[in-house]
């Protein structure tokens, strides 16, 4: 079970990095290949599904987990009704975790994406 918890952080960071890669595609005026875009979206969707059933070991890790999941949902083009239900569940988890004491930057990031997805 210990490796599971250690790997959660790695998975959180990987999802955040993949989302960041997608968001910054084409910044250098490079052409964006549709296949690359499709592959990144597929990776994000798979990573979301892998992380969704997980819970953080600490409040801070739970907040980082919710943040990365919500980041993934915000850019995913594979949204379906099941994903919408999962996203709503993560929003509820986020609402609960934001009531706890968290490092300010993490809380601000989580609150920002939470508000964005609710609007």
Residue spans for each PLM region:
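Intrinsically disordered, low-complexity regions
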Residues: 9-12, 16, 45-48, 99
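Generic low-complexity, intrinsically disordered sequence content enriched
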Residues: 19, 41-44, 95, 114
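A generic structural signal for ordered secondary structure
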Residues: 87-98, 109, 113
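Alpha-helical junction/boundary sensor with strong preference for TPR arrays
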Residues: 47-51, 55, 94-105
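Amphipathic alpha-helical repeat scaffolds of TPR domains
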Residues: 5-31, 56-77, 104-119
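Helix-turn-helix repeat elements of alpha-solenoid scaffolds
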Residues: 33-47, 80-92
């Amino acid at each position: 079970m210990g490796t599971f918890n250690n790997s959660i952080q790695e998975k959180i960071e990987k999802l955040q990095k993949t989302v960041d890669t997608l968001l910054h595609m084409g910044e250098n005026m490079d052409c964006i290949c549709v296949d690359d875009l499709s592959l990144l979206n597929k990776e994000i969707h798979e990573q979301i599904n892998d992380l969704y059933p997980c819970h953080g070991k600490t409040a801070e890790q739970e907040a980082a987990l919710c943040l990365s999941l919500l980041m993934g949902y915000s850019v995913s083009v594979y949204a379906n009704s099941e994903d919408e239900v999962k996203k709503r569940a993560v929003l509820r988890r986020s609402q609960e975790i934001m009531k706890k004491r968290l490092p300010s930057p993490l809380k601000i990031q989580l609150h920002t994406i939470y508000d964005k997805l609710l609007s």
